[in-house]
From Swiss-Prot:
Designated gene of the protein: TM2D2
Compartments reported by the entry: Membrane
Protein name per its UniProtKB record: TM2 domain-containing protein 2
Protein keywords: Glycoprotein, Membrane, Signal, Transmembrane, Transmembrane helix
Family: Belongs to the TM2 family.
Membrane topology: Multi-pass membrane protein
A family per Pfam: TM2
Length: 214
């Protein structure tokens, strides 16, 4: 069959060739656009903050635009960071002054009795934030927990206090031996320790606080 002086098969072949050429051009344009976006992305984001070179799991930006949705890492809530324990200087004032932060003593019952310091914190992996991912977080209390529970110690003191079990558990070994040898000071020492425990006068010897039961 002839259409306009050209066989139909010839026209169909030309149409298929034109369609194939168009697909090749489209794929070429898409690949060029993708490579251009991949090159431009590290330079500037839509939020107006520059990507640094680093691992993908610890993405961070340099803080520049205050209207950007990306906040400083130091402003992240506690659930998005992990912090080290406060540095224990064991009363060494010189070490405290050289480092600039840390705890000279731990423990305390009232807020005014507890020292507060800065601790080293870092943003969790996968959290995107601006500025260095490691920073100092302010106003952390100088308290630690070493497995001592008030209720357990009180029960030890009430039922086994005459044998010094309560003071052994709290680490007061010397006075615990004396309490054991005197059978709780004939009951007087046993009663005094009960009062001291209830009022907060008898605490763990390592300066730790009572563990909280939730």
């Amino acid at each position: 069959m002839v259409l306009g002086g050209y066989p139909v098969s010839y026209l169909l072949l030309c149409g298929q060739a034109a369609l194939l050429l168009g697909n090749l051009l489209l794929l070429h344009c898409v690949s060029r656009s993708h490579s251009h976006n991949a090159t431009a992305e590290p330079e500037l984001t839509s939020a107006g903050a520059a990507h640094p070179e680093g691992s993908p799991g610890a993405a961070s930006w340099e803080y520049g635009d205050p209207h950007s949705p990306v906040i400083l890492c130091s402003y992240l809530p506690d659930e998005f960071i992990e912090c080290e324990d406060p540095v224990d200087h064991v009363g060494n004032t010189t070490a405290f002054q050289e480092l600039g932060y840390g705890c000279l003593k731990f423990g305390g019952q009232a807020y005014r009795d507890v020292e507060h310091t800065r601790v080293q914190c870092r943003a969790l992996d996968g959290i995107e934030c601006a500025s260095p991912r490691t920073f100092l977080r302010e106003n952390k209390p100088c308290i630690k927990y070493t497995g001592h529970y008030f209720i357990t110690t009180l029960l030890y003191s009430f039922f086994l206090g005459c044998f010094g079990v309560d003071r052994f558990c709290l680490g007061h070994t010397g006075t615990a031996v004396g309490k054991l040898l005197t059978l709780g000071g004939l009951g007087i020492w046993w009663f005094v320790d009960l009062i001291l425990l209830i009022t907060g006068g008898l605490m763990p010897s390592d300066g730790s606080n009572w563990c909280t039961i939730y």
